[in-house]
From Swiss-Prot:
This is Sine oculis-binding protein homolog. InterPro entries: RAI2/SOBP, Znf_MYM. There is a cross-link at residue 672 (Glycyl lysine isopeptide (Lys-Gly) (interchain with G-Cter in SUMO2)). PANTHER family: RETINOIC ACID-INDUCED PROTEIN 2, SINE OCULIS-BINDING PROTEIN HOMOLOG. A motif (SUMO interaction motif 2 (SIM)) lies at residues 648-652. The modification Phosphoserine is found at residues 627, 694. The gene is Sobp.
Length: 864
């Protein structure tokens, strides 16, 4: 906006032009200005300095020198009104120049009125609402046209309406609002500062002459955290460093992060030299020591060569610390012995077998498998030793080495170059291939060994192999650069003898073969870390077997199990022979479904058939009332009735992909057929749903009666399609065998009257609305029920109250087979949700549990 107003172009022109940065900047500036104004007003209310978002990067903490030049980082609101010892002109200007890059801070109009150098500044900036120079017109423009100024408060360019003389500068404001806000903010700041009295606590601020006029509380100054670069209005900034390099952090977290960052950077800066010096052969220092101190802040100031000389070689130190072995470590080069400060090396336990620090023992030349060093003397205190091809090795070390070899064969693979000389630094081979020139022997020891030494597992004691600390590196031929662990004291795994992996104790050091890839401060643990790999363990989750698709003709679609039945089942015969006028298809389906029981489940289907015979007239599905076949089939069924009774015979339409099956528990009970008043009417309502309803079965009482005793077998006849023949209601009269429960005799209550009461409470699942049966479905249901010989109607089904209970579990105390036709809601106008109640065979409730669960599952699937 400022530039546009200066140029005299209306914003429309600029927008009309191809959109460029100015347009974006304008939008951003407007939003920033709005945010700044709002925030500054809020801050002003609470006595805080105004914040200029534009200067977020530049609101600096304390001044600290950069390139020897005292940088003055002036906070957004640094008050220049206080008379201060003047800084050199160039220093103040330099601070402003530095800040200008970030829409730097400049004092309001004072910048144009008086050069920055002429203003009174303490060595440390004072809070003053500063205007970023980019938005300040050149002094010439300001002088020429005082009409337009940049408001010292809202930072917008506008006509000068108010001005406030603040000591050395005059602040101009574009409106009374800005003027009042600025005055209020200054007043609150000064008041807070006076109350706090902490102005003197900041030594950086030299308040030589404190004028009470507009002295600002310094600790309310907008400070920017040196780490997170956020402006925190906290009085507890943490100072770090001294003098001009003092940094301020808003929290201990930022301070710690800063320290870590510095540590990391310095470590990286020093690390390459350290690694190179130790990894690349510095011949002169090789003999002087094989250990290097861990990189610490103190060591950064020490030349690496000195550090190398000072660092005790961990192996020698370990050897000396170890009882018998170390005493004999005379072969160690004098520098090594001198350097060995046992205190610095955490030798875990002096148990470890100092593999011949003793001069008497010849150094183990790490040769290819052929050259296996003689067994080395074992000090009396050493742990149980395992004799390997290389000689005795402490058992724990041997075990670890074997594990390591198995885990990291590639690293162990490199052919070890044996150093015949006892001084060869095999302890150092741990940093094997790190840029070591293939040509020269290398002194890896300094960095590698100390690094790995302390990491040794407590039971791994730094063994000092003769080849380890004092061996002159010159004797160690450099491994090929590619060899992973060229200097490992044992041959590559491929060359290893078949016997137990003869890994010398050196593996303690050898394990850190990864060290070259890791900066020295990282400690490589020489013992294998077992990382558990998750192995999926199958957890069996029982999933009910539900057949949503139409079962084959030979199977009933109970969803529980397909019950293939011999086609010759009497129920099938009954279904077809039952004189009912069922379409052959219906009868066929009924026969197939009702006859679906294999020997295992035949009891279900057969018991179903007798029960249905008892119910024959009630269930008009495909059975004729007096179907002799049904009656004849009863004896066969009777035998089977007592078979598996948990099965559920589903008389639902098999072709329905959706599962309309309601699973009823097979209950061992005698079918008690009773008539329920109005049952006929109910049944008739939807009886001839598709016109497929067979003529009313006048009487199946005969079949029903024999079925009664046989009905003891558990049968779950589930008819999900609501098929009821009007005649069915009339038809079956309760067999004399079955005592009718106190239900009206008009309707056959297949001993379900009591059940009905229970079912009413339990809410039988009559999915009248959920089960949509096509005409074929209804036909099939009719056929199936006829085959089942449903003699009795299920009062529960007939009870409208029961029809509501779609999800109720069937708590059938004694009732067994329930042919539950599920009405298909208004799929066809003729199809009214008439429920065919089928007699329930009263059965022992002991079988209730699994079928109830299955039934619940089926109900749930149905209602889905």
């Amino acid at each position: 906006m400022a530039e546009m107003e200066k140029e005299g172009r209306p914003p429309e022109n600029k927008r009309s032009r191809k959109p460029a940065h100015p347009v974006k900047r304008e939008i951003n500036e407007e939003m920033k200005n709005f945010a700044e104004n709002t925030m500054n007003e809020l801050l002003g209310w609470y006595g805080y300095d105004k914040v200029e978002l534009k200067d977020g990067e530049d609101i600096e903490f304390r001044s600290y020198t950069t390139d020897g030049e005292s940088r003055q980082h002036i906070s957004v609101l640094k008050e220049n009104s206080l008379p201060k010892p003047k800084l050199p002109e160039d220093s103040v200007i330099s601070s402003y120049n530095i800040s200008t890059g970030y829409s730097g801070l400049a004092t309001g109009n004072g910048l144009s009125d008086s050069p920055a150098g002429s203003k009174d500044h303490g060595n440390v900036p004072i809070i003053v609402p500063l205007i970023p120079p980019p938005f300040i017109k050149p002094p010439a423009e300001d002088d020429v046209s005082n009409v337009q100024i940049m408001c010292a408060w809202c930072q917008k360019v506008g006509i000068k309406r108010y001005s406030l003389s603040m000591g050395s500068e005059v602040k101009s404001f574009c409106s009374e609002k800005c003027f009042a806000a600025c005055r209020r903010a200054y007043f609150k700041r000064n008041k807070a500062r006076d109350e706090d009295g902490r102005a003197e606590t900041f030594p950086q601020q030299h308040y030589a002459k404190e004028t009470p006029r507009l002295a600002f509380k310094n600790n309310c100054e907008l400070l920017v955290c040196d780490w997170c670069k956020h402006i925190r209005h906290t009085k507890e900034y943490l100072d770090f460093g001294d003098g001009e390099r003092r940094l301020q952090f808003c929290s201990a977290k930022c301070l710690n992060q800063y320290k870590m960052d510095i540590f990391y950077k310095e470590t990286q800066a020093n690390l390459p030299a350290g690694l190179c010096s130790t990894l690349h052969p510095h011949m002169e220092s090789k003999a002087e020591g094989t250990g290097v101190q861990l990189l610490t802040p103190d060591s950064w100031n020490i030349p690496l060569t000195d550090a190398r000389r000072k660092a005790p070689s961990p192996v020698t130190a370990a050897g000396q610390s170890q009882g018998p072995g170390p005493s004999s470590s005379t072969t160690v080069s004098p520098s090594d012995t001198a350097n060995c400060s046992v205190t610095k090396i955490p030798t875990p336990v002096p148990k470890s077998l100092p593999i011949s620090e003793t001069p008497s023992i010849p150094p183990v030349s790490v040769q290819p498998p052929a050259s296996i060093g003689p067994p080395l003397g074992v000090p009396p205190r050493s742990p149980p030793m395992v004799m390997t091809n290389r000689g005795p090795v402490p058992l724990p070390i041997f075990m670890e080495q074997q594990i390591i070899q198995q885990i990291r064969p590639p690293f162990i693979r490199g052919p070890p170059h044996h150093a015949s000389n006892p001084n060869s630094p095999l302890s150092n081979p741990m940093l094997p291939g790190i840029g070591a020139p293939p040509g020269g022997p290398r002194n890896l020891g300094p960095t590698s060994s100390p690094m790995h030494r302390p990491m040794l597992s407590p039971h791994i004691h730094p063994p000092s192999t003769p080849t380890m600390p004092g061996n002159p590196p010159g004797l160690l031929p450099p491994p090929p650069p590619g060899a992973p662990l060229p200097s490992l004291p044992f041959p590559p795994v491929s060359m290893m003898p078949n016997g137990p992996m003869p890994v010398p104790q050196m593996m303690n050091f050898g394990l850190p073969s990864l060290a070259p890839l890791v900066p020295p401060p990282t400690l490589l643990v020489p013992y294998p870390v077992i990382v558990p790999l998750p192995v999926p363990i199958p957890i069996p989750i029982p999933i009910p077997h539900v057949n949503d698709s139409k079962p084959p003709n030979g199977f009933s679609s109970n969803g529980e199990s397909f019950v293939p039945s011999a086609p010759g089942d009497s129920s099938a015969a009954g279904g077809k022979a039952g004189g009912r006028s069922l379409s052959p298809r219906d009868s066929k389906q009924g026969s197939s479904k009702s006859a679906d029981s294999p020997p295992g489940s035949s009891g279900q289907a057969l018991s179903l058939a007798p029960a249905e015979r008892g119910r024959g007239e009630v269930v008009d599905l495909t059975r004729r009332a007096g179907s002799p076949a049904g009656a004849g089939g009863q004896p066969g069924f009777a035998g089977v009735l007592h078979g598996p009774q948990d099965g559920v015979i589903d008389l639902t339409v098999g072709h329905r992909a959706r599962l309309h099956n309601v699973i009823h528990r097979a209950l061992h009970a005698h079918v008690k057929a009773e008539r329920e008043p109005g049952a006929a009417e109910r049944r008739t309502c939807g009886g001839c749903r598709d016109g497929h309803c067979s003529p009313p079965a006048a009487g199946d009482p005969g079949p029903g009666a024999p079925a009664g005793p046989e009905a003891a077998a558990a049968c779950n006849v589930i008819v999900n399609g609501t098929r009821s023949a009007p005649a069915e209601a009339k038809g079956a009269e309760p067999p004399p065998e079955q005592p009718p429960p106190p239900a009206p005799p008009k309707k056959l209550l297949s001993s379900e009257e009591p059940v009905v009461n229970e079912l009413e409470s339990v809410k039988e699942n009559n999915c009248a609305s959920n089960c949509h049966l096509d005409g074929e479905a209804t036909k099939k249901l009719m056929g199936e029920e006829a085959l089942a010989g449903g003699d009795k109607s299920d009062p529960n089904l007939n009870n409208p109250a029961d029809e509501d209970h779609a999800y109720a579990l069937r708590m059938l105390p004694k009732t067994g087979c329930v042919i539950q036709p599920v009405p298909k809601p208004a799929e066809k106008a003729a199809m009214t949700p008439c429920v065919i109640s089928s007699p329930m065979l009263s059965a022992g409730p002991e079988d209730l549990e699994p079928p109830l669960k299955r039934r619940c599952l089926r109900i749930r699937n149905q209602n889905k």
